[in-house]
Design a protein with these regions (language model features):
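Internal/C-terminal transmembrane anchor helices
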Residues: 39-66
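Repeat-blade elements of multi-bladed beta-propeller folds
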Residues: 90-94, 134-157, 181-230, 263-290, ...
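Aromatic (tryptophan-biased) beta-strands that constitute blades/sheets of beta-rich domains
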Residues: 72-133, 167-176, 198-206, 211, ...
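Inter-blade boundary loops/turns of WD-repeat beta-propellers
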Residues: 110-113, 163, 236, 302, ...
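Conserved hydrophobic/aromatic positions in well-ordered beta-strands
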Residues: 106, 159, 232, 298-300
């Protein structure tokens, strides 16, 4: 636990407030002088010097071996998974819509994971190149549905791979471009042939209905944000653009953002499927300007791509519908990371 006199937990608790204390000690005489009051430096510099000495000693202590922080709780046993409850798919970035990240399977566990051997290796053809950390990086979490694994590459190319053999099934060449931060962290998946989970919490509003999808259309679809500001829907069966979504498979996410040149607005995290709504945030570049695109969060109909709602944190009415030519409030907080969704409340 982060308590007691163990070195590392102690450092984690005291380093920041200790730094503030040193700053306060040495600023106080100047502040008192500014107010035409006695500086009281004798009462300040001595404890300030002692605090600096303690700070130096603590820093030096980081290079001396210390006892590790041991787990002091009781280890819980592995919970067996009933056969009828074994998970079949990984359909969301974080496994469940809420992002549990844990899978309901127990065949592989901490006792036998060291025995795993690669069954196959697949090369996407999109080579990550990021010597300074701002380039193309493979940071994806694939989706697995049935016998298919769905991948996305740093330039937003999407590939379906056979889960058993590792052989490619289809590839959608998107080849999105950005001057920095080329990466695709994940995808979303929607199956129109399956019932949409309904909320169980009393008073919750059910997911909005969607148009029926023709059997020859995109009944199963992959949804992806791109680094150049698009939301794309692909047929999960063959990789073709879903013609009923947006403009022949694409929604322009730069619409309503105002002045948003590359790379001020880049989408790297997976979109979030919330019932029948695809929710997208976005990355706004840091420390570039005081006039930046807004951090609006938007929800789109998963079948048609039509904008259902927007949450604009800088607007007095955060759900206001934009008129023609208007844009969302500039330089507002953004949601860059993956988001979670609670089906029990929608």
């Amino acid at each position: 636990t982060d308590a007691g006199l163990n070195f590392w937990p102690l450092i984690s608790r005291l380093m920041f407030p200790g730094s503030l204390a040193i700053l306060a000690f040495f600023l106080l005489p100047s502040l008192r002088h500014y107010e035409n009051r006695p500086s009281a430096w004798k009462w300040v510099y001595v404890p300030g010097a002692l605090a600096i000495a303690a700070f130096i000693a603590a820093f030096a202590g980081m290079f001396v071996p210390h006892d590790p922080v041991e787990f002091s709780g009781q280890e819980r046993p592995l919970v067996p998974v009933a056969k009828n409850e074994m998970q079949k798919n990984w359909e969301n970035y974080g496994n469940t819509p809420g992002g549990s990240r844990f899978v309901a399977l127990d065949q592989i566990n901490r006792n036998n994971i060291s025995e795993l051997k690669p069954a196959w290796t697949f090369h996407t053809g999109d080579t990550p190149l990021s010597p300074d950390g701002n380039g193309a990086e493979d940071q994806q979490t694939p989706l697995q549905v049935g016998d298919k694994v769905f991948l996305c590459t740093p330039h937003n190319n999407v590939i379906a791979v056979d889960a058993d053999s590792g052989k490619p099934i289809w590839k959608a060449e998107i080849n999105a471009k950005s001057s920095v931060w080329m990466r695709c962290r994940g995808l979303a998946y929607f199956d129109a042939t399956q019932p949409v989970p309904q909320p169980t919490v009393p008073g919750s509003i059910p997911p909005a209905p969607v148009a029926a999808v023709d059997a020859a259309g995109c009944q199963r679809r992959i949804l992806m944000n791109t680094i150049d500001g698009r939301l794309i829907a692909l047929n999960a069966d063959n990789g073709q653009f879903c013609q009923d979504f947006g403009n022949k498979g694409t929604v322009n996410l730069l619409e309503g953002m105002g002045h948003a040149p590359d790379p001020q607005y880049v989408l790297t995290s997976a979109p979030t499927l919330a019932g029948t709504t695809v929710v997208v945030g976005g990355r706004i570049s840091d420390n570039v300007s005081t006039d930046m695109p807004g951090g609006v969060i938007r929800g789109y109909d998963v079948v048609t791509g039509q904008l259902r709602w927007a949450f604009d944190p800088g607007n007095n009415n955060p759900n206001a519908v934009l008129a023609a030519g208007e844009h969302y409030v500039r330089s507002t907080p953004n949601s860059w990371a993956p988001m979670s969704y609670d089906p029990s409340m929608n």
